């Protein structure tokens, strides 16, 4: 499913002395099956923007469309179900006595049949790479990475067509980060899911997304393919961001070895380029 935003403006605490414009005339489209990153410094409007995608926030002005239908009126409730949002530290929202009950919570609220709930929970726990053996355990007995997967399963079990992830690997160790992003990457590739990643990590964005939206002071500063956006290092630095560290390293290396290509975004690309140079040498 696709998302389209036109003329979206959002003002916090409108009409009070604390009024603040968080989004200012945002226009964007995210196509079905895309993997899009949204980056920006703290307070740039990233999280406020994505909370409009499933109606958690309502525009002060402007419109949000899901698959061509405006997120208002009689169809709004059904359209909202198509967008699942996983916020930072989602495991803090785990509360049931078993993993099964936590994952099933949303389905129970929807009034689905017990057999159907059982089938969907088992399917989803496998989808996030966990064993069905943990379904009877307390979620609080699990590791940090497992809790994060269980929390994500609680969203995925509702079968959204669009998955929004706000800093999905925050607080995890390097192994846990890699596992979460491999899970998300597989969901995108194998399930043809539209994925929107909000992140402060330029390395994660460079490695996984196809297109980047750069937010600054409630507006879209840049938008384009990941490689073309990260080439604009000066613009990124002016708004408090940066390209991935490996990009800067390869540019420094090119000063010493002019033959190498410095249009590099990931460690894997850097390894490949250096191996190519060594073979030629």
UniProtKB/Swiss-Prot annotation:
ATP-binding (A) component of a common energy-coupling factor (ECF) ABC-transporter complex. Unlike classic ABC transporters this ECF transporter provides the energy necessary to transport a number of different substrates. Forms a stable energy-coupling factor (ECF) transporter complex composed of 2 membrane-embedded substrate-binding proteins (S component), 2 ATP-binding proteins (A component) and 2 transmembrane proteins (T component). ATP binds at residues 40-47. GO terms for cellular component: ATP-binding cassette (ABC) transporter complex. PROSITE patterns: ABC_TRANSPORTER_1, ABC_TRANSPORTER_2, CBIO. One of its GO terms (molecular function) is ATPase-coupled transmembrane transporter activity. Transmembrane segments: none annotated. Keywords: ATP-binding, Cell membrane, Membrane, Nucleotide-binding, Translocase, Transport. It comes from Acetivibrio thermocellus (strain ATCC 27405 / DSM 1237 / JCM 9322 / NBRC 103400 / NCIMB 10682 / NRRL B-4536 / VPI 7372). Belongs to the ABC transporter superfamily. Energy-coupling factor EcfA family. It is a peripheral membrane protein. Pfam families: ABC_tran. Its EC number is 7.-.-.-. This is Energy-coupling factor transporter ATP-binding protein EcfA2. Residues 3-242 form the ABC transporter domain. It is found in: Cell membrane. Its main location: membrane. NCBIfam families: ECF_ATPase_2, PRK13637.1. InterPro entries: AAA+_ATPase, ABC_transporter-like_ATP-bd, ABC_transporter-like_CS, ABC_transpr_CbiO/EcfA_su, ECF_ABC_transporter_ATP-bd, EcfA2, P-loop_NTPase.
């Amino acid at each position: 499913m696709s998302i389209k935003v036109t003329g979206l403006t959002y003002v916090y605490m409108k009409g009070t002395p604390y009024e603040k414009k968080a989004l200012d005339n945002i226009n964007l489209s995210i196509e079905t099956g895309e993997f899009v990153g949204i980056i920006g410094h703290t307070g740039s409007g990233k999280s406020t923007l994505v909370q409009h995608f499933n109606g958690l926030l309502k525009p002060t002005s402007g419109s949000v469309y899901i698959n061509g239908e405006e997120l208002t009126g009689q169809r709004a409730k059904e359209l909202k179900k198509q967008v699942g949002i996983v916020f930072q530290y989602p495991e803090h929202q785990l509360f049931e006595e078993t993993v099964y009950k936590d994952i099933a919570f949303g389905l129970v609220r929807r009034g689905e049949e017990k057999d159907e709930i059982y089938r969907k929970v088992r399917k989803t726990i496998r989808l996030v790479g966990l064993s069905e053996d943990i379904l009877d355990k307390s979620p609080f007995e699990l590791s940090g990475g497992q809790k994060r997967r269980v929390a994500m399963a609680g969203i995925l079990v509702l079968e959204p067509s669009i998955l929004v992830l706000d800093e999905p690997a925050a607080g995890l160790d390097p192994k846990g980060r890699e596992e979460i992003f491999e899970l998300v990457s597989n969901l995108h590739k194998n399930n043809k899911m539209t994925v929107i990643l909000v992140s402060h990590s330029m390395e994660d964005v460079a490695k996984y997304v196809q297109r980047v939206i750069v937010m600054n002071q409630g507006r879209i500063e840049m938008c384009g393919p990941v490689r073309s956006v990260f080439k604009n290092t000066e613009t990124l630095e002016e708004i408090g961001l940066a390209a991935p560290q490996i990009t800067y390293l390869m540019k420094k290396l090119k000063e010493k070895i002019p033959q190498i290509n410095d249009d590099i975004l990931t460690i894997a690309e850097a390894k490949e380029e250096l191996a190519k140079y060594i073979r030629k040498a």
